[in-house]
Amino acid sequence: MLDTLERNDSTGSAANAEHFDVLIAGAGISGIGSAYHLQQQCSGKSYVVLDMKDTFGGTWETHKYPGVRSDSDLYTFGYRFKPWVGAPIASADEILKYMGEVIEENAIGPNIRYGHRITACKWSSADNRWTVEAIRLADGSKATFTCNFLWMCQGYYDHEKPYTPDWEGVSDYKGLFVHAQLWDPRTDYAGKRILVIGSGATAATVVPAFAEKAAHVTMLQRSPTYFFCSENKNELADRLREIGIDEPTIHRVVRAQIMHDQDVMTKRCQTEPEVVFEELKELVRLFTGKPDFEFAPHFTPKYRVWQQRLAFCPEGDVFRAAVEGKVSVVTDEIDRFTEKGVRTASGEEIEADIIVAATGFRLSVMGDIPFSVDGKAVNWNDTVTYRGMMFTGVPNMAWVMGYFRASWTLRVDMMGDFVCNLLNHMDKMGAKRVDVQLRPEDQGMPLSPWIEADNFNPGYLMRGLDKLPKRGDKPEWRHNQDYWAEKDQIPATDLTGAEFKYS
């Protein structure tokens, strides 16, 4: 059983607050991984994990649309400490099973409080602690916690309010209109005409899944996306199993292989994007068996490969469905919704029984929770990030922000090491507080938005840059997207450096 702790008091007042050394916000892939590292590396510290849902899983529990699966391989998306045994691309149910095993095997469950929505985080310099206010969703009562260190692992997008453009005429449409993020799994779509708006990772997942039962699926995209087609297996892992190698060794070796290949791929996308695109097209031809497969205009993006995430396409399923006539693609702008469907800018009307918006999500910085330091509200856009983990002017807090191109969880493990090293260092010093601060040589450093648009520019980030902290022009003051650089830099961090201020 994954038991939760129960609180004795019901007033929710600060006087009755429960105190923990560390409070972890979120019981998704980041929060569970962080809890594991805290238990292993800071075994004497008390902690609690708060999550608004009634179970663990985060994204993988929230998303219910057909075919929901990872868009990263599970050898690298899985934790480094627990081997992944299975196909590289996994379903949400398989990922939840994996996470549940981590919770059970490491007795994390008793430290998780489900059904708690955090409403405020307040730092007091007088007390050197955070006060975290929450609401118990079961009955609406208030709960208050205090902690020495706050570890934000709640992800970076809004699970309840996805991004939906303000299309004209939506209310005129007589069929079912829903955002993929809010899909009800009880919906019967067999034999229906389905229109999917979007072309990113979500569309790449739902389109072939819908095509299995729907009468027909149309994917309407404003602009094309790059797809990476591959078999859903890892030959090296399969071969090592055949010769009797143990799973921990397989996990370690295959992770290293995949991370190396991803690093090479990322660099090639920057130095020879045209060559990489030709290779991606060749994979489509291979999986469809169509050497004359036509890529223009629907599968020829206008941006460079890897400026946005590649949409993974196991077994070429999207393209095979298109070749089989189950799926059609339209590249156009939406003029307006009509009673029967959507009219495009070019005048074509696409009729559908169900319209699914796969238009991305809305960025949520720190869960959109109000933060304050000594009574002053925190505006994250006024802060400068330390390696995408900590922030100037905000003491005793870390935020897990993973990689965009590589698997998110690689950074969860790395940050777990960093935060635990920091906490242990503070204990040795007898410090109660740590701030990150610009060093003398950083004064006057030019500050820029969180990430360069020329480097990585998905819509959700571009729409939310004004909510995110600033970055500097030095490695310490930016969220580096290069795992291979960070895997050496972050473990070698000098915690006595001038960028850290202890008291």
Predicted regions and their residues:
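Charged, low-complexity surface segments at secondary-structure and domain boundaries
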Residues: 260-271, 303-307, 438-442
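Glycine-rich active-site loop/strand segments that organize a redox cofactor
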Residues: 52, 57-101, 224-282, 286, ...
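C-terminal, flexible cofactor-proximal segment of oxidoreductases
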Residues: 203, 226-229, 248, 384-385, ...
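A short, structural micro-pattern
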Residues: 71-73, 365, 391, 454
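Short clusters of hydrophobic/aromatic residues that line enzyme substrate/ligand-binding pockets
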Residues: 70, 79, 167, 299, ...
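Flavin (primarily FAD) cofactor-binding/catalytic cores of flavoenzymes
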Residues: 2-27, 33-54, 59, 91-195, ...
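Short glycine/proline-rich turn/loop motifs
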Residues: 77-84, 262, 299-304, 396-401, ...
